Every structure is written in structure tokens, then in C-alpha cells.
Swiss-Prot record:
Belongs to the acylphosphatase family. The active site is at residues 20, 38. One of its GO terms (molecular function) is acylphosphatase activity. It is an enzyme of class 3 (hydrolase). Keywords: Hydrolase. This is Acylphosphatase. Its EC number is 3.6.1.7. It comes from Vibrio vulnificus (strain YJ016). The gene is acyP. It comes from the Bacteria. NCBIfam families: PRK14426.1. InterPro entries: Acylphosphatase (IPR020456), Acylphosphatase-like_dom (IPR001792), Acylphosphatase-like_dom_sf (IPR036046), Acylphosphatase_CS (IPR017968). Residues 5-90 form the Acylphosphatase-like domain. It catalyses: an acyl phosphate + H2O = a carboxylate + phosphate + H(+).
Length: 90
């Protein structure tokens, strides 16, 4: 199956609530690679690469996030795949 990479930008109460940790855990659980990092404006940027059905499942999870977060908006776009090791928290 082809590998797809997507960039997600998650807005809401997503910093200081363990969002990146839970996102990394969920990504690894779905056999995805990539990263989650805080942005200066309070959003979280997530890059995820893997099988398309797993990316879709991950996107559905990101729409809700962990119980400690409040996701107001999720933007996504397909990007060129790069080599990532694991699912990092940056």
C-alpha cells in the first residue's frame, strides 16, 4: 500500500494539556511516523506519514484529541513524504 504524508494544524486548547504526548502515542499505535510540535500562535503542528486508512483514523482522533484538550479546528493538507523515525515530540 502507498504511503501518504499529511500536515495537520490543530487549533483550540491544545498546548499545556499533554496534546503532543497523546498525539505521539496515538501515531505510534497506528504505525505512523512523524512529529507533533507547538507553534508560537498556540496551535500544534502535526506531520503524519503512513498507510492512508491509518492517516484517516488518525485525523478522526485529532478532531477530538485527548480529554484534556479542546480542539476547535483541524486543518490538513497532503505533503511530500520525507523520512521520519518514530513519532517525535518537538
Amino acid at each position: 500500500m502507498a504511503i501518504r504524508c499529511e500536515k495537520f494544524v490543530v487549533s483550540g486548547i491544545v498546548q499545556g494539556v499533554g496534546f503532543r504526548y497523546h498525539t505521539s502515542h496515538q501515531g505510534l499505535k497506528l504505525n505512523l511516523v512523524g512529529y507533533a510540535k507547538n507553534l508560537y500562535n498556540g496551535d500544534v503542528e502535526v506531520i503524519a506519514c503512513g498507510e492512508p486508512p491509518k492517516i484517516e483514523e488518525f485525523a478522526k482522533w485529532l478532531e477530538q484529541g485527548p480529554k484534556t484538550a479542546r480542539v476547535d479546528e483541524l486543518k490538513r493538507e497532503e505533503i511530500t513524504c520525507r523520512e521520519y523515525q518514530g513519532f517525535e515530540i518537538l
